């Protein structure tokens, strides 16, 4: 306010919006609670170097995720000991490695990844690739990953 008090050239317009001055702990707590409730539903988003995933549904011995692989994102060349996976492409054209074979899938196409198979997803496109992943198995945790290659330095 010290600058405005000394200015000779001021214009003002009426602004009719909710306003809260963060001058007290009470106001800071109020804003914190608003933001906490707004983002509470997003707690199942997990960010990775290649993009992110959201846990959509977790049942007995199965887990449904939505994967979002950013442009030029590459998942590890990996395998799992306790789960198989089924991928359904909903957006983009991912390059899939399954054992020694490579495929390019389009929206609406799917692929089954048997337990113990070496696999990878790559997004060579400019827009994100979206995949619905169904995991089926006795252990459905991120610790069930053996990484053979990883462009982000996470290989075992």
How would you name each of these model-derived features?
Residues 1-111, 117-120, 140, 146:
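Left-handed beta-helix
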Residues 43-47, 120-156:
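Double-stranded beta-helix
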């Amino acid at each position: 306010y010290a600058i405005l008090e000394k200015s000779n050239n001021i214009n003002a317009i009426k602004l009719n919006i909710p306003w809260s001055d963060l001058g007290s702990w009470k106001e800071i707590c109020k804003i914190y609670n608003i933001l906490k409730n707004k983002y509470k539903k997003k707690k199942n988003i997990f960010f990775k170097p290649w993009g992110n995933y959201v846990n959509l549904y977790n049942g007995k011995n199965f887990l449904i995720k939505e994967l979002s692989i950013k442009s030029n994102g590459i998942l590890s060349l990996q395998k799992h000991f306790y789960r198989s996976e089924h991928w359904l492409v909903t957006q983009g054209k991912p390059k899939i490695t399954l054992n020694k074979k490579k495929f390019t899938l389009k929206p609406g196409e799917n692929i089954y990844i048997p337990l113990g198979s070496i696999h990878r997803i790559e997004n060579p496109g400019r827009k994100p690739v979206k995949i619905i992943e169904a995991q089926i198995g006795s252990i459905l945790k991120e610790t069930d990953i053996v990484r053979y290659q990883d462009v982000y330095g996470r290989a075992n």
